[in-house]
């Protein structure tokens, strides 16, 4: 089972919008995750701990990014944006294996962008 966590041990139930970019030679890439009203921002979640990063966890292990930012509207948290950077083809392949598992577990689909 593939899960996303912001506080270790607490699974995030909100499904993110994920945008991928990749260099032309395939050596690097970026995944931007946008969560609208994630569970971790609810008041009772703060009792469980602080957000220390975004953890992508599956049977192979975990991928971690510390590039996590909250989005506020009128002083209240409304969303989270996290950026995961892949610095090699191996990192990209590992990330895609995680996303395949996460997609299967959550009924997501992949839509390739047009090159126009």
UniProtKB/Swiss-Prot annotation:
Lineage of origin: Eukaryota, Cryptophyceae, Pyrenomonadales, Geminigeraceae, Guillardia
One GO BP annotation of this record: photosynthesis
One Pfam family cited in the UniProt record for this chain: Psb28
Compartmental location: Plastid, Chloroplast thylakoid membrane
Organism superkingdom: Eukaryota
GO cellular component terms, A-Z: chloroplast thylakoid membrane; photosystem II
Protein name, as recorded: Photosystem II reaction center Psb28 protein
Topology of the protein relative to the lipid bilayer: Peripheral membrane protein
Subunit field text: Part of the photosystem II complex.
Keywords attached to this entry: Chloroplast, Membrane, Photosynthesis, Photosystem II, Plastid, Thylakoid
Organism: Guillardia theta (Cryptophyte)
NCBIfam families: PS_II_psb28
Coiled-coil spans in chain: none
Family affiliation: Belongs to the Psb28 family.
Keyword Lipid biosynthesis among UniProt keywords: no
């Amino acid at each position: 089972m593939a899960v996303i966590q912001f506080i270790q041990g607490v699974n995030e139930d909100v499904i993110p919008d994920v945008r991928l970019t990749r260099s032309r030679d395939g050596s690097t890439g970026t995944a931007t995750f946008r969560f609208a009203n994630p569970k971790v921002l609810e008041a009772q979640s703060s009792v469980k701990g602080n957000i220390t990063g975004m953890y992508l966890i599956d049977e192979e292990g975990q991928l971690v990014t510390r590039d996590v930012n909250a989005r506020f509207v009128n002083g209240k948290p409304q969303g989270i944006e996290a950026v995961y950077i892949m610095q090699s083809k191996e990192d990209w392949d590992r990330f895609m294996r995680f996303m395949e598992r996460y997609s299967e577990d959550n009924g997501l689909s992949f839509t390739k962008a047009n090159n126009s």
